[in-house]
């Protein structure tokens, strides 16, 4: 049994292992109250299946990347992430990336097509508007 767990641990993508080694919390004290509430949903739901450090330190930053990630988690059996909590998690991750990972967002947007950039910026603005943050 121990060997099976060891083999499973070895099968984890090295990139993901690197994310898992980073910080597992975010200081959201300066975030809008609604973002702080969504962070609580993120921490409660996402920690059931994996370390919080994984999404916190990942190279996902754009809204479409977070949308794919959250939908993948929602489809996992027993995840407990329904559409309501999934939207809160998505909104938080998009907002957090636009603040904490701004340089990464900017670098990715610089490589995007004009249409992709406009779509991503509109989604980021929508989340900022929801949270009442400019």
Predicted stretch roles:
Residues 10-33, 43, 83-134:
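Flexible coil segments in periplasmic/lumen-exposed cytochrome c-class electron-transfer proteins
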Residues 5, 75, 98-102:
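A generic secondary-structure boundary signal that marks alpha-helix termini
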Residues 40-52, 67-71, 75-76, 87-91:
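C-type cytochrome heme c attachment motif
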Residues 33-61, 79, 96-101:
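Periplasmic/extracellular electron-transfer cofactor-ligation site
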Residues 2-9:
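Sec/Tat signal peptide C-region and signal peptidase I cleavage site
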Residues 1, 62-65:
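Short, solvent-exposed linear motifs at loop/edge-of-secondary-structure regions
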């Amino acid at each position: 049994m121990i060997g099976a767990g060891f083999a499973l641990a070895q099968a984890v993508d090295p990139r993901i292992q690197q994310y898992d080694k980073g910080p597992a919390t975010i200081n959201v004290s300066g975030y809008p109250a609604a973002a702080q509430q969504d962070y609580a949903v993120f921490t409660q739901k996402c920690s059931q299946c994996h370390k919080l450090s994984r999404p916190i330190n990942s190279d996902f930053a754009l809204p479409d990347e977070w949308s794919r990630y959250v939908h993948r988690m929602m489809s996992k059996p027993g995840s407990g992430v329904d559409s309501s909590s999934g939207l809160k998690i998505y909104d938080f991750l998009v907002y957090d990336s636009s603040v904490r990972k701004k340089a990464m967002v900017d670098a990715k947007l610089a490589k995007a097509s004009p249409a992709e950039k406009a779509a991503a910026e509109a989604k980021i603005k929508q989340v900022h508007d929801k949270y009442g943050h400019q």
